[in-house]
């Protein structure tokens, strides 16, 4: 007799051409991911071939009850690591029935920036280092920490191994493989400085695809932690005191930066970022003031700085980039709860389009 696991793992491709498409969108808080599934004829690899759908926006904080319908526009397709076969995950953005982007649809403006001729010609590349913290479900206390108490001081946990230093590796590895299966360009993982905190990296990705991939990677992580009975938080400072916060360092380059003489282009771009520091900080995530203190490998939130190999700066340039005279730089200011659509497009807009 079949058990529940057998039925969950049924391979539909043996018996039907129908597929399950899981439509994913961002809810009213700007950080809560929502999803629901529908049956379609398959296989499908082009999002433009997928139908639009709708949902009750009054239940997600995105529409009033008397006019609650919000329309989902499919934008990117990924393979579904949970259902497998020809089943898919579909990243969507959200519109009114009249076709206007709703206020929480940050993808719409980002796509406009990335499709502008100036930005498209520069082919911006991004590598995003997404940090997060795993919490015990019943206590909201970091995984591996004693209930009501604290582990030993930071030091042995970064990239650490062993049962007393590494907590949640099964979740991290499952997420790593699931992202690779889905077609996300996840480039690595590591344990972070605070115990119970981890990081995955997505990229290099070009333009709008960076935001799509980070959001779907977050979705997959939340689904895996759901299965494991663990809570994932993207709070930039989940534990007050002498503990590292969580960021989303954003590595960035343009075609001009990757060519000979690119280091001068990088320095000019950093100068532009300095001039718009306040605007960027305002868009780089909620609660970032608790993280950007000038301690724990961060710069002070009120002061812009940059340096070569300096992890205490707002922007870090790698030693290799300096030596080669071309390459990329790292914006270390974004918080772990930042919206990648906002951050990636804002960096491109400031460094390519904006004229001081």
UniProtKB/Swiss-Prot annotation:
Domain of life assignment: Eukaryota
Gene Ontology BP annotations: glutamine biosynthetic process
One of the record's GO cellular component terms: cytoplasm
Lineage, highest ranks first: Eukaryota, Viridiplantae, Streptophyta, Embryophyta, Tracheophyta
Residues covered by the GS beta-grasp domain: 19-99
Species in which this protein is naturally found: Zea mays
Alphabetical list of Gene3D superfamilies matching this protein: Glutamine synthetase, N-terminal domain, Glutamine synthetase/guanido kinase, catalytic domain
Annotated family: Belongs to the glutamine synthetase family.
Function field: Plays a role in the flow of nitrogen into nitrogenous organic compounds.
Molecular-function GO terms, alphabetical: ATP binding; glutamine synthetase activity
Compartments it resides in: Cytoplasm
Tissue localization of expression: Found in all the tissues examined with higher expression found in tissues of the root.
Catalytic activity, EC: 6.3.1.2
Annotated SUPFAM superfamilies: Glutamine synthetase, N-terminal domain, Glutamine synthetase/guanido kinase
Name of this protein: Glutamine synthetase root isozyme 3
Complex formation: Homooctamer.
Principal place of residence: cytoplasm
Pfam families: Gln-synt_C, Gln-synt_N
Limits of the GS catalytic domain: 106-356
InterPro entries, alphabetized: Gln_synt_N, Gln_synt_N_sf, Gln_synth/guanido_kin_cat_dom, Gln_synth_cat_dom, Gln_synth_gly_rich_site, Gln_synth_N_conserv_site, Glutamine_Synthetase
Catalytic activity: L-glutamate + NH4(+) + ATP = L-glutamine + ADP + phosphate + H(+)
Alphabetically ordered keywords of this record: ATP-binding, Cytoplasm, Ligase, Nucleotide-binding
């Amino acid at each position: 007799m079949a058990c529940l696991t057998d039925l969950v793992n049924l391979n539909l491709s043996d018996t039907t051409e129908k597929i399950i498409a899981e439509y994913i969108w961002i809810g009213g808080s700007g950080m809560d991911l929502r999803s629901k599934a529908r049956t379609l004829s398959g296989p499908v690899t082009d999002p433009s071939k997928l139908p639009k759908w709708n949902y009750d926006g009054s239940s997600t904080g995105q529409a009033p009850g008397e006019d609650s319908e919000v329309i989902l526009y499919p934008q990117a397709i990924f393979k579904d690591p949970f259902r497998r076969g020809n089943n898919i995950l579909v990243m969507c953005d959200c519109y009114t029935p009249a076709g206007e982007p709703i206020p929480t649809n940050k993808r719409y403006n980002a796509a406009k920036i990335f499709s502008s001729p100036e930005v498209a010609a520069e082919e911006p590349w991004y590598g995003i280092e997404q940090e997060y913290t795993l919490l015990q479900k019943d206590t909201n206390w970091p995984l591996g920490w004693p209930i009501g108490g604290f582990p030993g001081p930071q030091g042995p946990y970064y990239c650490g191994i062993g049962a007393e230093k590494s907590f949640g590796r099964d979740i991290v590895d499952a997420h790593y493989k699931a992202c690779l299966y889905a077609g996300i360009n996840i480039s690595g993982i590591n344990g972070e400085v605070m115990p119970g905190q981890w990081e995955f990296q997505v990229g290099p990705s070009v333009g709008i695809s960076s935001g799509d991939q980070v959001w779907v990677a977050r979705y997959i992580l939340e689904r895996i932690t759901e299965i494991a009975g663990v809570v994932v938080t993207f709070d930039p400072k989940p534990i007050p005191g002498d503990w590292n916060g969580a960021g989303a360092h954003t590595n960035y380059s343009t075609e001009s930066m990757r060519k000979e003489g690119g280091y001068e282009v990088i320095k000019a771009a950093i100068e532009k970022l300095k001039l718009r520091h306040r605007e960027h900080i305002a868009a780089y995530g909620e609660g970032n003031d608790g993280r950007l203190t000038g301690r724990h490998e961060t710069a002070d939130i009120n002061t812009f700085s940059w340096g070569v190999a300096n992890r205490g700066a707002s922007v870090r340039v790698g030693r290799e980039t300096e030596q080669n005279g071309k390459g990329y730089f790292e914006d270390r200011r974004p918080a772990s709860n930042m919206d990648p659509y906002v951050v990636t497009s804002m960096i491109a807009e400031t460094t390519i389009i904006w004229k001081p």
